[in-house]
Structures are given as structure tokens and as C-alpha cells.
Amino acid sequence: GEDGVLQGLLEATNVPYVGFGVAASAVGMDKLLMKAAFAAAGLPQVRYAGVRKADWGSPPRRAALLPGIEALGLPLFVKPACAGSSVGITKVKRAEELDAAVAAALAVDATALVEEAADAREIECAVLEGTGGGPTEASIPGEVVPGHEFYDYEDKYIDDRSYSVIPARIPDATREEVRRMACAAFDAVGGAGFARV
């Protein structure tokens, strides 16, 4: 249901539900659409490129994509555009790892996202839609401290090496900026109900 299909079925059969609607769910699942929504809202993000399976499989089109990808520098993250739970994500540290990483992402989805790796922490908020026309609100941020190099599928579901710190150990000004940006991201995709951002 994360991609809007379940919401579409519920709407087509007049079954009430809570949370994101069809369009917001689709945008929230598709990382390239989500990045476009974030850009339109003025939210900062790392540089990235989209890679379609048909383009990567064509030597001339792949050659046309490579300069833009190489301009992102290393390391990179390569991930399926439409997948969750960190499935199919690879951290690319050397140029010769790129092809296998893109292939892994394209095995999960027809489009891959290639983005520069940021030296960042996993800070997240619970975000709640405003009621009665009120503003969107965000909780105090928490931090997920990964047990691996990055917060991957194994960290999320298999081993117990990651842990959470609530509240996140960040300066007050940063905490408020994280909350503001989390609300802006929620609103940018047309969020409804609540979400973890």
C-alpha cells in the first residue's frame, strides 16, 4: 500500500481509510518524484541522477548518462527509485563498483536513483497533519544510529546493532530546523494523517 495502489483500490470501492491518499503515496514511494516535489518546495538535497533500465542497457545512452553520474563524485548511493526498507541499496566507493550497484537497483525497479553520499546522520521526526486548517506539526527529532556503515536492510530487520537516541543529540537551532524541514517535506508530497520523516 505504500505506492498508492491500495489507496486507489479503497477509493474505487468507497472504503474509508486514513493516511496518505493515492497521489501522495505514489510520490512518497518514488524517490525521483519525491525529489522533484522537494525541489519545488525549496528543500535542500544532495545532487542526483535518475537511470532508467532501458537507458542503462543501451551502450550509447549509458555513455550519455555517465558524465552526469561521474560529476556527482564518490562515494555514491545507488538505490531503486521505487522500493522501501533499503532493499537494493549499494554504497559505491570506487568507480568500478557502479555497474554492479546500478544492476542491483535495476533488479528491484525499472529506474535507479544515483546520488552523492552525504556525511549525514539518520535524524527523523514523527509528523502529524494539522487539524482544522492548522499547521503541520513535528515531534522532537530522534536519531537512528546504524550498526553498519549505513542504515541498511540488515540493520532494520535482521540484526540488533542499530539503536535509537530520543531526543537526537543536536543543537536547539538544528532541532527546530529539522522539525521545520520535516513538516515542509510532508506538505510537499501532500501528506495526510501522519508519517515518519
Kindly give the residue locations of the regions a language model identified.
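A short, GP-enriched loop/loop-strand-helix hinge that lies immediately N-terminal to
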Residues: 1-29, 44-53
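Short glycine-/acidic-enriched loop or helix-start segments at secondary-structure transitions
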Residues: 2-5, 87-88, 124
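A general structural signal for well-ordered alpha-helical segments in protein cores
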Residues: 3-6, 31-34, 98, 138, ...
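Conserved metal-phosphate-binding beta-hairpin within the catalytic cores
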Residues: 10, 116, 126-127, 186-197
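A short, local hydrophobic-aromatic micro-motif
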Residues: 18, 46-47, 139, 151, ...
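Active-site nucleotide/adenylate-binding loops and adjacent lid/helix of ATP-dependent enzymes
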Residues: 27-121, 131-132, 180
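Phosphate-binding site of ATP-dependent enzymes
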Residues: 93-180, 185
